[in-house]
Swiss-Prot record:
Protein name: Uncharacterized protein SMPP2
Expression tissues: Nacreous layer of shell.
Superkingdom of source: Eukaryota
Length: 8
């Protein structure tokens, strides 16, 4: 879900 913020 992109929790690291990259949207992947």
């Amino acid at each position: 879900d992109g929790d690291d913020g990259d949207g992947d």
